[in-house]
Amino acid sequence: MALTWTIIWWCLLLVILVNEIAAIYTVFREKRDIAATWAWLLVLTLIPGFGFILYAFFGRKLPHKQLARIKSQTQLKLKQALERQKQQFINMPKPKDQTVQIYRRTVMLFQSIDDSFLTRHNAVNIFTNGNALFKKIFDDIAAAKKSIHIEFYTIYNDQIGNELRTLLEQKAAEGVEVRVLYDSWGSMGVWPSFYDHLREVGGYAAPFLMSQSNFFDFRINYRDHRKIVVIDGEIGYVGGFNVGDQYLGRVPKFGPWRDTHLRIVGGGVYGLQRRFIGDWNASM
């Protein structure tokens, strides 16, 4: 009996030792800030086995090459234009109107902390109802002449999702450039084959930052929560609505859905187009 307990204790110690070694290797093989390093080390140490499951979902970072590709695409044709605009505001005479001075400081703040640039001559419509929003999006898509770029976290295989796909297939068949970027986690349950006919008629569809062979990825971080539509480089949509019947109040358990989305015509569309192109190129 004593020998049995001795074997059990040795096996337990071996498991703990292996878990500790695996935890240290897992955490320190990726560069991260000190707080995150120690937090994950504690999780993996104090919750053997299950801690690694949590890490698979929440802790893994993207490969360095992929992060570098995202960063390079984010700066796509932006730095020079942003620097010119910064200099314009720095050299601008100080306005006498205090309100204008406050706006000037706000613009310069956004330019400095987030590389955001000021755009002008924008006409903006606000939508808080999904039915009105998608009717307008569909009307603009139907009138597209050159390109349709769509990026959503969620595109469901339901009534509104199929209506959108059918319309995109029609436009692609007409020769319009159609590109769809979706998040594989947010659109879980929608197989890549959902877009097969769109591809057959000349359109493109791809999951964000993943190849088709990696459709299932347990990584919950580094997801694409953007909801962007850019049509002909002239009309842009951005906001909170995803593509799904629940966002139109058609699913009883969700009830009426309230969110906010913008339709933009003007200089601001350039920012949406740049964001889409950067995400698309980084995902290829």
Go through each PLM region and give its residues.
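N-terminal localization/anchoring segments of enzymes in phospholipid and broader phosphate metabolism
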Residues: 1-284
